[in-house]
Swiss-Prot record:
Gene this chain is encoded by: rnpA
Protein name, per record: Ribonuclease P protein component
Entry-linked Pfam families: Ribonuclease_P (PF00825)
Hydrolase is among the record's keywords: yes
Entry function: RNaseP catalyzes the removal of the 5'-leader sequence from pre-tRNA to produce the mature 5'-terminus. It can also cleave other RNA substrates such as 4.5S RNA. The protein component plays an auxiliary but essential role in vivo by binding to the 5'-leader sequence and broadening the substrate specificity of the ribozyme.
GO molecular function ontology, one term from the record: ribonuclease P activity
Broadest EC class assigned to this enzyme: hydrolase
One annotated Gene Ontology cellular component of this protein: ribonuclease P complex
């Protein structure tokens, strides 16, 4: 992902933790913070050393980044997302990670509504 789509600084992470809203499932915790002045979304990833060695942690981060790359058009812009991976993610494959991330993002309101338009007229 391009640098402008990343959250890297500790102060930015802390702001999302303090002012953001958290949503979780068994595999991920997602903090979201509205940034209306920002025309794009940004993501920050947190994978604890408890999940495994560096190889496993980096693989999890690659999976999550790839999910966001594929869902780029569906993710609501103008928000910061901090994704924290939990223990079960270490044993999951890419398809399972994507399904779980979709679930928690939908729950957090981080995905655009699908093409369900209802005409009231």
């Amino acid at each position: 992902m391009k640098k402008k789509y990343r959250i890297k600084k500790n102060e930015e992470f802390q702001e999302v933790f303090r002012r953001g809203v958290s949503t979780a499932n068994r595999q991920f915790v997602v903090y979201t913070l509205d940034r209306p002045e920002q025309p794009y979304f940004r993501i920050g990833l947190s994978v604890s050393k408890k999940l495994g060695k560096a190889v496993v942690r980096n693989q999890i981060k690659r999976y999550v980044r790839q999910c966001f790359l594929e869902l780029k058009e569906e993710v609501v812009p103008g928000k910061d997302y901090v994704i924290i991976a939990r223990q079960p993610v270490a044993e999951m494959g890419y398809a399972e990670v994507k399904k779980s991330l979709l679930h928690v993002l939908r729950k957090a309101g981080g995905l655009k509504k699908r093409g369900r338009t209802t005409d009231l007229a």
